[in-house]
A protein has these predicted regions:
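N-terminal catalytic or cofactor-binding beta/alpha core of small enzyme domains
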Residues: 1-109
Length: 109
């Protein structure tokens, strides 16, 4: 089974004010992709937090976009590359997009 070439991973909690950025933006993106006839090229994934398991969602993709609310980010958003060589953080809680990408490079790629 082939996967869409692009994946968008959005995290956040809709019940926590500005932490709802990821899910709200993902919902708008889904509508736009449908309207433009591009939905088949994207897999949209929503979760409360980025987890190690999300590294598996990167397999066989051309590109990935991580969406999350941030603290002290320039308004209204910041778009920046993720360093795959950042050391993965270890936590039983959420991990950063850089850590997800680092796990992907260590385990999947």
């Amino acid at each position: 089974m082939s996967v869409p070439p692009f994946v968008v991973l959005a995290c956040g909690n809709p019940s926590r004010g500005d932490d709802a950025l990821g899910p709200l933006l993902l919902a708008r993106l889904e509508v736009w992709l449908d309207e433009e006839g591009l939905a088949d090229a994207f897999e949209l994934i929503e979760d409360f937090q980025f987890q190690i398991e999300h590294a598996l969602d990167l397999k066989d993709r051309c590109a990935a976009l991580f969406i999350d609310a941030g603290e002290r980010t320039p308004a209204p958003f910041a778009l920046c590359p993720v360093d795959a060589h950042a050391p993965p953080s270890h936590s039983t809680h959420a991990i950063s997009p850089a850590a997800v990408l680092a796990v992907y490079h260590r385990v999947v790629k």
